[in-house]
């Protein structure tokens, strides 16, 4: 999936041109409407600054939250407006970033017409229009009508065929990838298609069902697969072990057996924890004890991997040249059950220091490495949750397929 990028566009290609840039500014806000984490805004800066430095007029579009309703009028709510984002972006860029009250229409056309080379405009939330997620040609064409070319830098929504990620490419050429998408493809694709070996994947999270595709694909590619999180109890139950009150997906027991058999057949080392930390309730202050997976007591539930499992996992990872991590080892929101996840985060930081490529594949693992304070020590932290998983599953992402081939 080699695509043209912003780097392929010169100042001559861009000077005075109106560039529609799809970004992912879906940042978290607190109760006062203040941004609590501006990572996604900062992640888009290299693309924005490259375009403005080449004299382009940059028109940004993003979704924000999930406005509900059949019509525009029902969807428009102040809490879904991009106002705080425009303010933060203007601080980061050191210049005003105006924001119209809509993403299409006369006000937008007038503001775009008034733009000077190097100016930045942030359109209002594209999801105020039902045509965005429905990817209607009318809405896509209207959105594209104010621009000359298109850049997609929103990896987090690249797996969705929406008007602002896929529809607009039918009306704007060239359509290229921004630096963020380029980096995501470079790391995630090469990790799967052309990795330095040994290649290990660590997959956690509470449900096997949400990770089936990724586990099946990884079994075809990796040398070692380490499983943690709530999903491991489905595997234990499939082996005939008592799992107490631990989370189990009864309809996935046969699948768990199939996956274990497939790993054996392919010569992949599939590692499940040998001990777990169990609790008498799902709570931060629950009573906890460490037990072997063969002796989980009735009425108790597993909420983290145990110290022996951590040691085994660390040993298995010690010689790996590439490691992909997706999903926590336990309920890391509760400090008492965050030990396994934190230990793995520290191990990966150590491996990066030894020259290994460490890739955090989106979702909760990102929050985990940030909580531990080792985010800076990872080779790559993916900004997409579902998009990262789908790419690791080998699926084509509509928002990327639609861009010009290199």
UniProtKB/Swiss-Prot annotation:
Location within or outside the cell: Cytoplasm
The UniProt entry's GO biological process terms, in alphabetical order, are: gluconeogenesis; glycolytic process
Q: Name the chemical reaction catalysed here.
A: (2R)-3-phosphoglycerate + ATP = (2R)-3-phospho-glyceroyl phosphate + ADP
- Pathway assignment: Carbohydrate degradation; glycolysis; pyruvate from D-glyceraldehyde 3-phosphate: step 2/5
Binding-site positions, substrate: 24-26, 40, 63-66, 127, 160
- Top-level EC class as recorded in UniProt: transferase
Q: Supply the SUPFAM superfamilies for this chain.
A: Phosphoglycerate kinase
Which Pfam families is this protein grouped with?
PGK (PF00162)
Question: In the UniProt record, does the keyword tRNA-binding occur?
Answer: no
Annotated positions binding ATP: 211, 302, 333, 362-365
**GO molecular function annotation:** ADP binding; ATP binding; phosphoglycerate kinase activity
What EC identifiers does the entry list? 2.7.2.3
Q: Write the record's keywords in alphabetical order, separated by commas.
A: ATP-binding, Cytoplasm, Glycolysis, Kinase, Nucleotide-binding, Transferase
This protein's GO cellular component annotations are: cytosol
Q: Which InterPro entries match?
A: Phosphoglycerate_kinase (IPR001576), Phosphoglycerate_kinase_CS (IPR015911), Phosphoglycerate_kinase_N (IPR015824), Phosphoglycerate_kinase_sf (IPR036043)
**Known partners and oligomeric status:** Monomer.
The protein's matches in HAMAP family, at most eight in alphabetical order, are given as: Phosphoglyc_kinase
Hey, which family's this protein in? Belongs to the phosphoglycerate kinase family.
By what name is this protein known? Answer: Phosphoglycerate kinase
The organism encoding this protein is Cyanothece sp. (strain PCC 7425 / ATCC 29141)
Upper taxonomic lineage:
Bacteria, Bacillati, Cyanobacteriota, Cyanophyceae, Gomontiellales
């Amino acid at each position: 999936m080699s695509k043209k990028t912003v780097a392929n566009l010169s100042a001559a290609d861009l000077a005075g041109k109106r560039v529609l840039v799809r970004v992912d500014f879906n940042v978290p806000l607190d109760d006062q409407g203040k941004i609590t984490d501006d990572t996604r805004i900062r992640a888009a800066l290299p693309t924005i600054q490259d375009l403005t430095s080449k004299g382009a007029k940059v028109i940004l579009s993003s979704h924000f939250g999930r406005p509900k309703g059949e019509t525009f009028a029902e969807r428009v709510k102040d809490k879904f407006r991009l106002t705080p984002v425009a303010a933060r972006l203007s601080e980061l860029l050191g210049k005003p970033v105006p924001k119209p009250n809509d993403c299409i229409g006369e006000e937008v056309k007038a503001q775009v017409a008034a733009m000077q080379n190097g100016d930045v405009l942030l359109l209002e939330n594209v999801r105020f229009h039902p045509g965005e997620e429905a990817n209607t040609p009318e809405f896509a064409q209207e959105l594209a009508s104010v621009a000359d070319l298109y850049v997609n830098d929103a990896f987090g929504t690249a797996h969705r065929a929406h008007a602002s990620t896929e529809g607009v490419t039918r009306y704007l050429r060239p359509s290229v990838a921004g630096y963020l998408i380029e980096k995501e493809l470079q790391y995630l694709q090469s990790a799967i298609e052309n990795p330095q070996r040994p290649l290990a994947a660590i997959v956690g999270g509470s449900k096997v069902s949400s990770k089936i595709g990724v586990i099946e694909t990884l079994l075809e590619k990796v040398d070692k697969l380490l499983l943690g999180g709530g999903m491991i109890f489905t595997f234990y139950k499939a082996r005939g072990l008592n799992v107490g009150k631990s989370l189990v997906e009864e309809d996935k027991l046969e699948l768990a057996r199939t996956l274990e058999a497939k790993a054996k057949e392919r010569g992949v080392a599939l590692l499940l924890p040998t001990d777990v930390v169990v609790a008498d309730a799902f709570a931060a202050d629950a009573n906890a004890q460490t037990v072997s997976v063969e002796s989980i007591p009735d009425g108790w539930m597993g909420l983290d991997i145990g110290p022996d499992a951590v040691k085994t996992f660390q040993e298995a990872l010690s010689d790996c040249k590439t490691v992909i991590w997706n999903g926590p080892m336990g309920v890391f929101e509760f400090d008492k059950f965050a030990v396994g996840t934190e230990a793995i985060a520290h191990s990966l930081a150590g491996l990066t220091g030894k020259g290994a490529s460490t890739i955090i594949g989106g979702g909760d693992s990102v929050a985990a490495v940030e909580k531990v304070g080792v985010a800076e020590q990872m080779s790559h932290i993916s900004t997409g949750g579902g998009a990262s998983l789908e790419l690791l599953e080998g699926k084509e992402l509509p928002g990327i397929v639609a861009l010009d081939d290199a």
